[in-house]
């Protein structure tokens, strides 16, 4: 087991005391109060883990001291207890090491979820709809709120494209490994010969960005307003409530027409634009860090095939960690998605521990 520097732990405990005292004194302004409250919430978990680790380590040292005693019965008792006590200390150390890993500053944020049908025509659009329902059900189980920002329905159902806000604490941390190409293998309802078809859809999960995260210069925006359109292209209202925002430097275009209010559509379009620009900035920074590249579970590239959903076999396979679950229906219902997410998070943590020299 890698030793955890005691002075680092003491510094964390001291910081926890300072933040607690500052908040208790009630002298922080509103902005500082919010930041300190978030910091304290994060520190509380780490401090609890430090205390658990130190208690377990002290118990192990006590058992090891008993092994040095002259009483044969005490030595025998200590020898019997040591494996269990040592395992408990190592488990506490591992839990603490994970909490001490570098944090992704976006993990606690809400997210923008984008799903686009890929190869496979109508079947791909139906699969994109299946994926959206999977994430919507998963979000419901987590107590998150899902709001569709824009959608382009498929001719036989599903979506050619759907963009939604998923609001809640820690959404990005749980969904960020979903970015990539998802493949489905099944017999379409329109297939008369019973042949299995392969289709695909791409998923992108972007951390929701606030104005403090990314500055958007109004002079860089081209904003067009128009009447909202229905599925067949017909205008569905008489006011120009739909908004299309083009960010000239990057070429990013966002179109939103879901709300009747132009003001609300503009706000939603700006939220999506900020998220895309923020993710672009994060990707550029990540690409510059070789250690981060080694620690990623998959690249997060939208073209990277990350998962296959095989209906005839009732299985889901995540190719990044070679994990197969024969729980296709449960995964698509959102109830078993955590099994995949937890495995991906664990793999990511193991890679980070190795990169930090703690694995």
UniProtKB/Swiss-Prot annotation:
Residues 283-305 are annotated as: Disordered. Methylated by PrmC. Methylation increases the termination efficiency of RF1. Its main location: cytoplasm. The modification N5-methylglutamine is found at residue 234. The keyword tRNA processing does not apply. Keywords: Cytoplasm, Methylation, Protein biosynthesis. It is found in: Cytoplasm. GO terms for cellular component: cytoplasm. Signal peptide: none annotated. PROSITE patterns: RF_PROK_I. It holds the Pfam family PCRF. GO terms for molecular function: translation release factor activity, codon specific. InterPro entries: PCRF (IPR005139), Pep_chain_release_fac_I (IPR000352), Pep_chain_release_fac_I_sf (IPR045853), Prokaryotic/Mito_RF (IPR050057), RF-1 (IPR004373). Peptide chain release factor 1 directs the termination of translation in response to the peptide chain termination codons UAG and UAA. NCBIfam families: prfA, PRK00591.1. Belongs to the prokaryotic/mitochondrial release factor family. This is Peptide chain release factor 1. It comes from Methylobacterium nodulans (strain LMG 21967 / CNCM I-2342 / ORS 2060).
């Amino acid at each position: 087991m890698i030793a955890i520097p005691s002075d680092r732990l003491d510094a964390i405990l001291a910081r926890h005391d300072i933040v607690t005292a500052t908040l208790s004194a009630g002298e922080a302004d509103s902005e500082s109060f919010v930041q300190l409250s978030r910091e304290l919430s994060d520190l509380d978990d780490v401090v609890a883990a430090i205390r658990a680790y130190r208690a377990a380590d002290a118990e192990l040292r006590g058992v090891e001291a008993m092994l040095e005693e002259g009483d044969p019965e005490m030595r025998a008792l200590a020898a019997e207890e040591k494996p269990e006590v040592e395992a408990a200390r190592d488990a506490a150390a591992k839990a603490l090491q994970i909490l001490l890993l570098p944090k992704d500053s976006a993990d606690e944020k809400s997210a923008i979820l984008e799903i686009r049908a890929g190869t496979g025509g109508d079947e791909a659009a139906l699969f994109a709809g299946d994926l959206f329902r999977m994430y919507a059900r998963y979000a419901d189980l987590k107590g998150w709120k899902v709001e569709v920002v824009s959608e382009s329905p498929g001719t036989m159902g599903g979506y050619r494209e759907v963009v939604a806000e998923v609001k809640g604490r820690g959404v990005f941390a749980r969904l960020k490994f979903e970015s990539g190409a998802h493949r489905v293998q099944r017999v379409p309802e329109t297939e008369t010969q019973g042949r299995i078809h392969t289709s695909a859809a791409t998923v992108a999960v972007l951390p929701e960005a606030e104005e403090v995260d990314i500055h958007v210069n109004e002079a860089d925006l081209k904003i067009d307003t128009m009447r909202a359109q229905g599925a067949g292209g017909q205008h569905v209202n008489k006011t120009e409530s739909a908004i299309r925002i083009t960010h000239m430097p990057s070429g990013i275009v966002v179109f939103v027409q879901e709300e009747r209010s132009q003001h609300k559509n503009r706000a939603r379009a700006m939220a999506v634009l900020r998220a895309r620009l923020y993710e672009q900035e994060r990707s550029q920074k990540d690409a510059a860090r070789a250690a981060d590249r080694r620690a990623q579970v998959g690249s997060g590239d939208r073209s990277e095939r990350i998962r296959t959903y095989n209906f005839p076999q009732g299985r889901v396979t995540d190719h990044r960690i070679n994990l197969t679950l024969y729980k296709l229906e449960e995964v698509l219902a959102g109830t078993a998605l955590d099994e995949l997410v937890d495995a991906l998070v664990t793999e990511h943590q193991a890679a980070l521990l190795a990169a930090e020299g703690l694995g």
